[in-house]
């Protein structure tokens, strides 16, 4: 008996010793998980021009779309334009992560007017519009603004749908995407609190809340950070984009596109990446077989953000129910890729294939910065044209088709 | 030879990118708009007042980002908030282009000998160099710290520690929580002295 006690006491002592040793300060979230071999790497994220950049100084003529399509600037001067939501009366609402405002773009006979409608919000990245109300997902809560389209100059007070979503003020991926499902529930992500860390029970997930009751449910787990989702118009299945971890090299792991077909799947983070690549640290005692694989690998560090199924009537018939994905573009890669819109064709069995749809932002894959603009979200307009946002410059572009 | 050519081509591209960026916002327009700034920030943005930050040589995006945050009320200061309230986006980009184009002339100040090595260690321990760069000269929206005015640096660090200084992504507030008063003394002395080197 005695030797056992001694062992217990000794190990307790060792634990205390370990805690007494001053720990290294945690690095900023984007540097977290960087291996010693990459300590000299100068790769870094790209920061948007918050005051925007004028179209006049940008090479917009470099943007390329397939034959028959046309791309043009639709509105500018919208700081850090990110998520897009379409009002019943045609107002385009535009969110951001860092500017604390929500903007509205009103089309007045070919002229677009930009208004600041909401101010002082906490990372209001997620927005969605339904039945006259704008819902906003901030860092810590989701709110509702009723009848806002008639009151853009004097918006109503928010009504809280759900609160206390960020009790620990988590670092890392603290911004949220927001969408309304066919079930009328609000779907949102809670990102991982760093590059590669063990999430708590609510983090690295997609959740949903019933706006009528406030009841929360988990939709998917093991999702490092999703900043775009939509439902297949026919199957009604949820599809979403996901960002893989950083600092595993130029080609690994892929960012991914996922499909939720049944139950509450776990897609593997932090144990397994892209369905088949165990994490060097967290994957040691787990198997990728435990987790649901992605529907499609999109490319390493390509940063897929907003995605929508095309349900408009303007584009040729073969585009119907295809997904447009906005690729914000890689930073954690020595040779950059992305900064584009991709077209993903999916069949009803969930098979997916990807091809470029809009390119031209990437000008030099080795330069810093390598691009002059970055797509964030896509939105199908009532006439079937496609809007997309560029947070780097604060610009919205419109893609249309004519035979 | 091939490698040399490739390198030459790369630097030509870099030059082009730089000049097109400078052309984007208007340095001369910025110089005119910046006249009012000199009262506090010094001639050409080189401050001689320990409480006022120098703007000369800052990355353009760092200037524009802070002006934007002041204008939107996300960062508040009794002197700066009213100055920024009526700036247009073009004003902010012009001012940023101008100040970033000016050669900084930091005060001839050196850190106390005991703080020089200790300060450098702290900038590694607290990961300052990860975002502000190995020489603490900033990048993109991250300000240059090297040779910045000491009292200004102290006020920002103490503000981040007290969670009262505006912080977009929480990184500075988070790291400042671990700073002791002594750490702040050493860091301020070390960083403010980097301009003289």
Q: Model regions: which residues?
A:
Chain A
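Short loop/turn segments immediately following the C-termini of beta-strands
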Residues: 96-97, 139-141, 147, 191-193, ...
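Surface loop/turn motifs at the tips and blade-to-blade linkers of beta-strand repeat domains
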Residues: 73-78, 115-120, 161-170, 218-222, ...
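Asp-box/WD-like beta-propeller blade repeats and closely related beta-sheet repeat scaffolds
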Residues: 114, 123, 128, 140-181, ...
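Beta-rich catalytic cores
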Residues: 80, 98, 113, 120-123, ...
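A short loop-to-beta-strand structural motif that recurs across blades of beta-propeller domains
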Residues: 101-104, 141-143, 205-207, 256, ...
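Conserved beta-propeller blade signature
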Residues: 91-94, 133-136, 185-189, 237-241, ...
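Beta-propeller domain segments
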Residues: 21-66, 175, 192-195, 201, ...
């Amino acid at each position: 008996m005695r030797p056992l006690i001694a062992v217990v006491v000794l190990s307790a002592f060792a634990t205390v010793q370990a805690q007494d040793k001053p720990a290294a300060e945690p690095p900023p979230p984007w540097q977290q998980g960087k291996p010693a071999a990459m300590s000299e790497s100068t790769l870094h994220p790209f920061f948007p021009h918050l005051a925007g950049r004028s179209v006049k100084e940008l090479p917009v003529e470099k943007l390329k779309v397939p034959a028959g399509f046309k791309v043009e600037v639709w509105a500018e001067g919208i700081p850090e334009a990110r998520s897009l939501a379409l009002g019943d009366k045609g107002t385009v609402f535009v969110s951001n992560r860092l500017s604390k405002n929500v903007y509205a773009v009103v089309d007045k006979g070919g002229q677009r007017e930009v208004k600041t409608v909401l101010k002082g919000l906490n990372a209001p990245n997620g927005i969605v519009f339904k039945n006259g109300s704008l819902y906003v997902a901030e860092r810590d809560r989701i709110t509702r603004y009723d009848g806002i389209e008639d009151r853009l100059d004097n918006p109503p007070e928010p009504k809280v749908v759900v609160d206390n979503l960020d009790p620990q003020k988590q670092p890392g991926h603290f911004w949220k995407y927001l969408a309304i499902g066919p079930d009328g529930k609000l779907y949102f992500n809670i990102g991982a609190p760093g590059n590669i860390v063990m999430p708590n029970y609510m983090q690295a997930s997609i959740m949903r809340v019933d706006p009528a009751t406030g009841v929360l449910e988990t939709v998917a787990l093991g999702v490092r950070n999703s900043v775009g989702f939509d439902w297949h118009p026919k199957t009604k299945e949820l599809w979403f984009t996901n960002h893989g971890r950083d600092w595993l090299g130029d080609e690994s792991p892929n960012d991914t596109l996922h499909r939720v077909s049944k139950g509450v799947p776990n897609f593997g983070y932090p144990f397994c990446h892209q369905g088949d690549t165990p994490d060097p640290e967290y994957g040691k005692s787990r198997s990728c077989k435990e987790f649901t694989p992605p529907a499609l690998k999109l490319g390493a560090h390509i940063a897929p953000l907003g995605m929508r199924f095309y349900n408009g009537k303007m584009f040729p018939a073969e585009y119907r129910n295809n997904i447009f994905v906005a690729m914000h573009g890689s930073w954690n890669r020595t040779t950059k890729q992305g900064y584009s819109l991709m077209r993903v064709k999916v069949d009803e069995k969930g098979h997916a294939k990807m091809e470029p749809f809009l390119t031209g932002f990437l000008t030099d894959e080795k330069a810093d910065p390598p691009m002059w603009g970055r797509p964030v979200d896509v939105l199908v307009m009532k006439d079937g044209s496609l809007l997309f946002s560029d947070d780097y410059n604060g610009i919205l572009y419109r893609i249309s088709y004519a035979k | 030879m091939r490698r040399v050519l490739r390198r030459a081509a790369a630097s030509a591209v870099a030059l082009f990118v730089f000049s097109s960026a400078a052309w984007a916002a208007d340095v001369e327009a910025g110089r005119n708009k910046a006249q009012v700034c000199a009262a506090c920030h010094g001639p050409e943005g080189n401050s001689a007042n320990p409480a006022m930050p120098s703007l000369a040589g800052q990355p353009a995006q760092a200037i524009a980002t802070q002006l934007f945050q002041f204008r939107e009320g996300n960062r508040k200061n009794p002197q700066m908030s009213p100055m920024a309230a009526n700036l247009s986006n073009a004003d902010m980009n012009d001012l940023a282009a101008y100040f970033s184009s000016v050669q900084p002339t930091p005060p001839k100040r050196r850190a106390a000998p005991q703080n020089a090595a200790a300060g450098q260690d702290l900038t590694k321990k607290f990961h300052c160099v990860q975002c502000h760069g190995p020489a603490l000269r900033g990048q993109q929206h991250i300000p240059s710290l090297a040779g910045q005015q000491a009292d200004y640096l102290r006020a920002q660090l103490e503000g981040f520690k007290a969670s009262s200084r505006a912080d977009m992504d929480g990184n500075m507030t988070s790291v400042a929580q671990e700073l002791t008063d002594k750490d702040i003394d050493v860091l301020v002395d070390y960083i403010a002295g980097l301009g003289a080197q």
